[in-house]
């Protein structure tokens, strides 16, 4: 049994550590203030920005409605033990992950994560809100909103690699009905949580080799999306999006939903559709950070999937790297960009602890948002507008070594989570829970 002196000594040590952290934050606050940055305001603002956490990191995009392989030109690699196998395990894992994350959260769900009870099963074209009641209960208990995605992959009705663009009318109609069902489910999510639901339409439709007809599939794709969006919904509650992609595994030569197609569709249907950009879905030399202000010039709202592509859409865990920071900066710097941009994460790594993957990616983007909010953006804009490019460069370089780590520690403290040392909790969860899964 430990003595009172030992316990008292530990408490004193903890108090001194907290005082040291506050001293460091006060020092950082003064440094930022010299550049006109209010770190208290930055922290307060960062707490208000919702970021949608994707459920599919927890089980390698398997879902609950099939036991077949992952298709659609996407791929998970690795076989780290502890993958969630049931709705109960997935929800428990998400809970553990979210308990270690600062900031405001939403939950992003794919249609293949319908939770059927009492032996019930319906196909994707017959899905109903009741099949996602547990997700709604889970989100409401935690004060979170929900986003949604029709699942146009990993299903027998994906014929010859095509869904909404298929020349087979039966195939197209099946997927159109799936999309309409997802509109209804998205409306249910928003009505129940009181938070708008982003519903993203993405398919892996395309061809492995050079097609003879490039336009036909795109015309069919457009008509299918038109049919999906003919389903009645409240545009204040449901935010349908179309997402493009440059290529996928097995569809290297031609993707129906290309960047030009998807952006054009959203532009022609601004009243009911948003453009969604995934920063892994473009040529490796393109950067989504540069596209954000371009789209916000013309669209009232846009949506993002933030990932980390390595040479292709590899969906590596998001890190606090250059492009992640630039994406966050553009969200913050663009006029009302924070209020006009729906942010979600999208990555899946099966080679590492999946809870750690969730937490690392979410924290990395939170850190990027906080860093962006702590930039002297108005000063830098003024320097650019007055052609003081040398000074702008100097200040931008100076910003790279500002004490953002101390501001981050204070942000985490105010959010009730550890800035560092949180991996011990994940290791404990792995030892006590994940390692027991066959």
Language-model features: where?
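Acidic/histidine-rich catalytic cores of soluble enzymes
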Residues: 210-323
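Aromatic- and glycine-enriched pocket-lining scaffold segments that form the walls
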Residues: 196-210
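Short linear capping/connector segments at secondary-structure termini
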Residues: 204-206, 245, 347
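Alpha/beta catalytic barrel-like cores
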Residues: 18-167, 174, 183-184, 191, ...
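N-terminal amphipathic/basic-hydrophobic helices that include classical n-h-c signal peptides
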Residues: 1-17
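A structural/positional concept
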Residues: 178-180
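Active-site oxyanion-binding pockets that recognize sulfate/phosphate
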Residues: 165-172, 210-214
